[in-house]
Amino acid sequence: MPLFGAHMSAAGGVSNAIRDIVEIGGEVLQLFTANQRQWTPKAPSAADVEAFRRRRAAFGGPVFSHASYLINIANGDGAASAKAVEALVREFERCTALGVDAVVLHPGAHLGAGRGAGILRAARNIDEVFDRCGGQTPALLLENTAGQGTCLGGGLNDLAEIIDASRHASQLGVCLDTAHAFGAGYALHTDEGYRRCMEDIEYGPGLAAVRLFHVNDSLVPCGSRKDRHTHIGEGQLGEAAFVRLLNDPVFAMHPMVLETPKEDGHAADRRNLATLRRLAGR
């Protein structure tokens, strides 16, 4: 069966995210390692890093970081591009200190320069990040998008082309978000739509490249090019889409993280985790 978890807040210290994922019964954690709304956020203190590593050892599950939404790795503007690279380097440094397994990153927007130019710029900027970090670094997982505006990643081949264009392809992978895929036009709630999505993965980045799922239902219709998450089974995707994914033997042991609303805090996460486990036949 897949491993189920959630994105948890690191308010009050990153080690609190580990505490909270254990408290809700999660098996995998995603978090922001610093304030994702700031370009130069404060890094976790040495004491918090130590507490995180101690709790993480007891937790035992995979841990992923989500890079700041401010980072546009496909930006071709010199100053903006350098700022994005610097922010991702700092993210890698924090994740290395914490022992995080991989960083999730949106592939960015080409801002009118064109898809091809954006893909090449994303690959070059990613290469610069790995070149600067050197040695042992977390993996970098490119997340698909709903394809809004000039964002890359609506088509899964965008991710494949970024990976292929990078000198560090062996350190890159894919995070597949169900709500984003649905918004981009993959009808995951139907047999044919699910098959098409899996074929695009297989003949694009490759099934082995998928290392993480964001499991989110969608408030908006298939192909809307919008990104609006809701609780599992309560949106346009519906429970049938998740039954199909959660019971696909190809992804039997994959980590799957909720990014669903938390209007009543941890209670919402517990309900969504229970729904996922029920749909997976646990």
UniProtKB/Swiss-Prot annotation:
Biological process annotations from GO: base-excision repair
Cofactor: Zn(2+)
UniProt key word DNA repair: yes
Binding site for Zn(2+) 3: 180, 227, 229
Keywords: DNA damage, DNA repair, Endonuclease, Hydrolase, Metal-binding, Nuclease, Zinc
Residues bound to Zn(2+) 2: 143, 177, 214, 259
Listed InterPro entries: AP_endonuc_2 (IPR001719), AP_endonuc_F2_Zn_BS (IPR018246), Xyl_isomerase-like_sf (IPR036237), Xyl_isomerase-like_TIM-brl (IPR013022)
Cofactor binding description: Binds 3 Zn(2+) ions.
EC number(s) on file: 3.1.21.2
GO molecular function: deoxyribonuclease IV (phage-T4-induced) activity; DNA binding; DNA-(apurinic or apyrimidinic site) endonuclease activity; phosphoric diester hydrolase activity; zinc ion binding
Known catalytic reactions: Endonucleolytic cleavage to 5'-phosphooligonucleotide end-products
EC category name: hydrolase
Record-listed Zn(2+) 1 binding positions: 66, 106, 143
Keyword Metal-binding: yes
TM stretches of this protein: none
Alphabetical list of PANTHER family matching this protein: APURINIC-APYRIMIDINIC ENDONUCLEASE, ENDONUCLEASE IV ENDODEOXYRIBONUCLEASE IV
Functional summary from the UniProt entry: Endonuclease IV plays a role in DNA repair. It cleaves phosphodiester bonds at apurinic or apyrimidinic (AP) sites, generating a 3'-hydroxyl group and a 5'-terminal sugar phosphate.
Family the entry assigns: Belongs to the AP endonuclease 2 family.
Name this polypeptide is given: Probable endonuclease 4
Organism the protein comes from: Nitratidesulfovibrio vulgaris (strain DP4) (Desulfovibrio vulgaris)
Gene: nfo
